């Protein structure tokens, strides 16, 4: 018998512990994702998702793990042979690189020690050197270390180029402001 003092805690980036009200909601009957009750829920939460992500743009929920969302972004935003810049400072920055290579993209990497934030000036320098880069792939927060990267500053830099900024916000959204429209 475990007491409240000896409750096991999940100290991982995922899965995470659930609040009691979430556990209660998960105990309800399932609804079909192609029926009206589900559509009504999606219609109701869409405006809230926009506020959460700091955007006026439509937000598209995906029914997959975070890696699936990263794969969806790369496969839908770029074509085989496109050049992308990956700035990595941990496991999930490396995941961007792996996904991009697997999709047939030409990857230019900037690697930093785990636990360090990506210096925006390095992104600026590389984009000046390589104006043919179609996209910059970064984390808002590197899940493996907890470091928040300066997405706002990097967004200002990418707006001055033709490169599309693609941000993995999986471990940042909900715990740190992520004003996507302002960041670009």
For each predicted feature, which ranges?
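N-terminal "arm"/small-domain region of PLP-dependent enzymes with the aminotransferase-like
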Residues: 1-33
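Conserved PLP-enzyme active-site core in the AAT-like
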Residues: 5-8, 12, 16, 44, ...
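Conserved N-terminal alpha-helix of the aminotransferase class I/II PLP-enzyme fold
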Residues: 25-72, 95-101
């Amino acid at each position: 018998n475990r007491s409240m003092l000896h409750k096991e805690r999940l100290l991982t980036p995922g899965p995470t512990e659930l609040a009691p009200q979430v556990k209660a909601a998960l105990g309800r009957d399932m609804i079909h994702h192609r029926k009206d009750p589900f559509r009504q829920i999606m219609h109701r939460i869409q405006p809230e998702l926009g506020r959460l992500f700091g955007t006026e743009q439509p937000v598209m929920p995906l029914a997959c793990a975070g890696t699936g969302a990263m794969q969806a972004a790369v496969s839908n935003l770029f074509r085989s042979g496109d050049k992308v810049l990956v700035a990595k400072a941990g496991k999930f920055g490396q995941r961007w690189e792996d996904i991009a290579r697997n999709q047939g993209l030409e990857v230019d990497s900037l690697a930093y020690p785990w636990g360090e934030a990506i210096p925006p000036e390095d992104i600026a320098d590389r984009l000046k050197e390589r104006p043919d880069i179609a996209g910059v792939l970064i984390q808002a927060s590197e899940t493996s270390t907890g470091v928040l990267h300066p997405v706002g500053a990097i967004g200002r830099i990418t707006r001055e180029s033709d490169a599309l900024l693609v941000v993995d916000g999986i471990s940042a959204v909900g715990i740190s402001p992520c004003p996507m429209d302002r960041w670009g």
